[in-house]
From Swiss-Prot:
This protein's pathway: Glycolipid biosynthesis; lipid IV(A) biosynthesis; lipid IV(A) from (3R)-3-hydroxytetradecanoyl-[acyl-carrier-protein] and UDP-N-acetyl-alpha-D-glucosamine: step 2/6
SUPFAM superfamilies registered for this protein in UniProt: Ribosomal protein S5 domain 2-like
Swiss-Prot/TrEMBL GO biological process terms: lipid A biosynthetic process
Cellular component GO terms held in the UniProt record: membrane
Residue positions binding Zn(2+): H79, H238, D242
Source species of the chain: Shewanella piezotolerans (strain WP3 / JCM 13877)
Protein name: UDP-3-O-acyl-N-acetylglucosamine deacetylase
HAMAP family hit by this protein: LpxC
Cofactor: Zn(2+)
Residues annotated as the enzyme's active site: H265 (proton donor)
Chain's role: Catalyzes the hydrolysis of UDP-3-O-myristoyl-N-acetylglucosamine to form UDP-3-O-myristoylglucosamine and acetate, the committed step in lipid A biosynthesis.
GO terms for MF: metal ion binding; UDP-3-O-acyl-N-acetylglucosamine deacetylase activity
Gene name of the encoded protein: lpxC
Catalytic activity from the UniProt record: a UDP-3-O-[(3R)-3-hydroxyacyl]-N-acetyl-alpha-D-glucosamine + H2O = a UDP-3-O-[(3R)-3-hydroxyacyl]-alpha-D-glucosamine + acetate
Pfam family, one: LpxC
Length: 306
């Protein structure tokens, strides 16, 4: 049987909030079976819990943010959620003492390292998957995103940026996720931004924590980071990383193919909501025998079992 997973023990880190520029402490704790991912704002009294479900995503400008009915928010969840999805973690309590998850280095890699450092524990319940049985598609102008039936999890993703440095890189990628592909090929891809936008954001008290320490920064012609890129195709890979995290608010890993063109946080969330609303287009499945499971899901990507 493919079992549900959580972290073996509590793990803690500190970082900087991308938009506030303030120090943020993040704690990840084990959670019982069928908990899902629960976020907690510990800086509020009493502490406020926000479940990581699609309908709680109410802000998608520059990041994915969970917002409850009282307006309490936790922003920039997508890189942490990509790490949770990529390592197959179903259940966890995420405590944060600020309105945003720390940006770390702008990728999912620090979160992957953090989770692997304490180990991943299998739990005494079957892991549940959302198996796509019919295509679901959302569009916004020329942008679109779609989920289609597929045995496993495959991504077919294209970006289109009119920038000489990005145009030189690969802007279209198809990845059939094997047991190690996420950690090795995707998790280290950093968020990227343009100097002209950063100047505007800072003038509006946003991206105060943004720097070349946690983003790939471009001017009109080139990458400004002294060390350059981590992957030749880091731009499209980071958009895939974002999608990994955005899709995980569906509540379970997806068995299917995710195809997208120029999509972002807003359209990714629209797709998840459209999927959940179209109940004849998917089913919840588990795998009694490991041999029956799609290869992508037989072992969590790069996980270290304690």
């Amino acid at each position: 049987m493919i079992f549900q997973r959580t972290v073996k023990e509590m793990v803690k880190t500190t970082g900087v909030g991308l938009h506030s520029g303030n120090k943020v402490t993040l704690i990840i704790k084990p959670a019982p079976v069928n908990t899902g991912i629960m976020l907690v704002r510990t800086d509020l009294s009493p502490a406020v819990e926000i479940p990581a479900v699609a309908e709680q995503v109410r802000e998608t400008t520059m990041c994915t943010a969970l917002v409850n009915d009282d307006g309490v928010r936790i922003s920039t969840i997508e890189h942490l959620f990509a790490a949770l999805a990529g390592l197959g973690i179903d259940n966890a309590i995420i405590e944060v003492d600020a309105p945003e998850i720390p940006i770390m280095d702008g990728s999912a890699s620090p979160f992957v390292f953090l989770l692997q450092s304490v180990g991943i524990e299998e739990q005494a319940a079957a892991k549940k998957y959302i198996k796509i049985t019919k295509p679901i598609r959302v569009e916004d102008g020329d942008k679109w995103a779609e989920l289609k039936p597929f045995k496993g999890f495959r991504v077919d993703f294209a970006i289109d940026f009119n920038h000489p440095e990005i145009a030189r890189s690969q802007q279209h990628m198809v990845m059939d996720f094997s047991s190690s592909a996420f950690v090795k090929d995707i998790s280290r891809a950093r968020t990227f931004g343009f100097m002209r936008d950063i100047e505007y954001l800072r003038a509006n008290n946003l991206a105060l924590g943004g720097s070349m320490e946690n983003a790939v920064v471009l001017d009109e012609y080139r990458v400004l980071n002294p060390d350059g890129l981590r992957y030749e195709d880091e731009f499209v890979k980071h958009k895939i990383l974002d999608a990994f995290g955005d899709l995980y608010v569906a509540g379970h890993a997806i068995v299917g193919e995710f195809c997208a063109y120029k999509t972002g946080h807003a359209l990714n969330n629209q797709l998840v909501r459209a999927m959940l609303a179209q109940q004849d287009a998917w089913e919840i499945v588990s795998f009694e025998k490991e041999a029956d499971a799609p290869v992508s899901f037989s072992v969590p990507s790069g996980a270290v079992f304690a």
